[in-house]
């Protein structure tokens, strides 16, 4: 499937070791689409061995040409304003998968998903659970049984 002329939301959660790959995917999506990044609190604020938060922020905003959504308040209008045709969560940590499967809405990314789903629009999740995939299986199964995931 080739995406062209779409408005795409691209959520980053705290799987920092995969940010470099996620940014490559982000670059590909921006070729023929308008992409806006959404970052969880941790992905927006934490410096890790995989890079400084400000460096990630600057690079992501440079790639997309758009300001990052990084607060719950700014993520909430995504659904009512129908901002995105599709929402991609890449990387999606096991913690975020658990929150989504249990309807815990306490980060900009989880709010973006909840708000986006109000319009029955698709959410694509790129799972990144490091060595915890088996522990996330139950939550992944719950999401697979819901519409638009």
Descriptions of predicted regions:
Residues 1-124, 128-149:
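A cross-family phosphate/adenosyl-ligand binding-site feature
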């Amino acid at each position: 499937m080739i995406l062209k002329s779409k408005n795409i939301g691209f959520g980053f959660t705290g799987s920092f070791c995969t940010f470099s790959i996620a940014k490559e995917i982000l670059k590909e999506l921006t070729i023929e689409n308008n992409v806006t990044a959404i970052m969880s609190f941790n992905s927006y604020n934490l410096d890790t061995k995989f890079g400084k938060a400000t460096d990630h922020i600057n690079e992501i905003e440079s790639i997309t040409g758009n300001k990052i959504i990084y607060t719950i308040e700014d993520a909430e209008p995504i659904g009512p304003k129908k901002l995105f045709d599709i929402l991609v969560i890449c990387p999606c940590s096991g913690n975020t998968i658990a929150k989504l499967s249990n309807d815990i809405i306490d980060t900009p990314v989880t709010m973006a998903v909840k708000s986006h789903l109000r319009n029955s629009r698709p959410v694509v999740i790129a799972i990144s659970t490091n060595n915890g995939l088996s522990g996330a299986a139950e939550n992944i199964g719950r999401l697979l049984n819901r519409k638009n995931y």
